[in-house]
Every structure is written in structure tokens, then in C-alpha cells.
Amino acid sequence: RRYVGALAYHLYDTKETELAHDLAHMRNLAAEYGIPIWMTEFSVPNDMTFSGAMEWMKIIHKLVATYDVSAVDYMWGFFGAWERNHTILSIEFLDGKYVQHHVGPLYYLTGQFSKFVRPGQVRVETHSSSQDLLVTAYKSGAQSVIVAINAGQEDRRVNVTVTDAVAPLHFSAIRTTVREFWSELEPIASDTSTFNVALPAQSVTTYRGGSIDSAGTLSGVGIKKSAQ
């Protein structure tokens, strides 16, 4: 055990039912020995399109929320101009010198997680009222991060309740849709533990914040710890 830092796997060449069984087995094995799980390589078809990149968002959510995965890697972070598919970032060089780079929906949607859910944060328990609303939440010290995916085809307005939070609350929000990338939304201020938000169809929105104490500084939010 002392020589094993993590359990790692890919998601290739497996039927859906077999994959679910295998991932559950790895989750249970990791829990038994207190070892983190890393999913170290995978890609999705049509990942240069927004709809394809949204499929990747669903995979990230399932790995983290259902199978307790601590690190999720895409197949290729970046390559040169000779490979534009299955890359989060494509960089062009000429005679060893930088020319330009290209990013697409995959870059921005992945960033809704990677820019804000940082190493050391702990995933906390969440519940959703709809199978199209995929929500995970994370906590580190005074900061809470909520990632909300509307995987459906209809815009939604929903209430977000931070259990056991001490009002007032303050959250910033950033969103990616087919028309906007990392768009900063109006900050959210609430005098209760519940606030109402709009989640456009096929979007990912990340909220950062927590309780505001009498001095106007961010204090801890009491949410039940679930998994790392």
C-alpha cells in the first residue's frame, strides 16, 4: 500500500454495463485502502463541437459524483498544428517559434471545473431535482464551489440551497454556453441559505463563495462532507 499513490484507469473498449461494474469495483477498492482514483485518459467523438464537449462534461460529472474520481484527464492537453482533434489546446509553431493557438468549447467547458475546483478541495454532498441538472459542490476552508450542468434542451430556473449555511451568502458566477465562454454573471447576494439562478439549456455554470460574516468577510459554509 505505501508504494501506491493512486489507482488509475482509462475508459476505452468497454461495454457500458461492464464499465459501470468495473468503475464501482475501483471506487470500492480505493475506499477500502484510502487511495485516490485518477481517470488518466479518454476522449469523446466530435469533441471540437459544443455538443460533443458537453458529452465530456457529463463524463466528468459521473466520474466525480458517482465513482469518487479525484483527477480527470482528457486524452491530449495540447498538440501542434498536425493534430486539431481531441485536444483542449492546439498550438502552431513555425521553425520552433510560436505562431498562434486555437481553443474551442472543450477548453472553456473543461475550465468550468479546472479553473475553480482546485487540488485540496473536498467534494461535498449534493442533490438535484432533475436528471438533466448535474450538480457537484466542493469546499476548502471558507470557500465553496458549485458546478451546475444543465444537460437538457430547455432553459431552467432553479433554487440552490446551501444546507446549514449561515446567511447572508455571496457567490460569484461564471458560465459557458454555445454563445458565451467564461462569461462573468452578476454576483449573487442572498439573505437566506437559498438563491434562485437561471441555467440555460446546454450550459455549465460555476459558483464560488459562501457565508459573509458581520465583518463582511467570507466565512465557512456548513455542508456535509461526502468524498474527496
Where are these regions (language model features)?
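Active-site neighborhood of glycoside hydrolase catalytic domains
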Residues: 1-42
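Loop/turn elements at helix/coil->beta-strand transitions in domains of secreted/extracellular proteins
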Residues: 2-5, 32-37, 67-72, 118-119, ...
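Conserved, mostly hydrophobic/aromatic
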Residues: 7, 63, 110, 146, ...
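Aromatic/acidic polysaccharide-binding cleft in carbohydrate-active enzymes
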Residues: 36-111, 123-129
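Surface beta-strand/loop "capping" patches
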Residues: 121-145, 216-219, 225-228
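Carbohydrate-binding surface patches
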Residues: 128-169, 202
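Solvent-exposed beta-hairpin/edge-strand motifs
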Residues: 163-182
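C-terminal beta-strand-rich structural cap/linker in extracellular carbohydrate-active enzymes
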Residues: 187-219
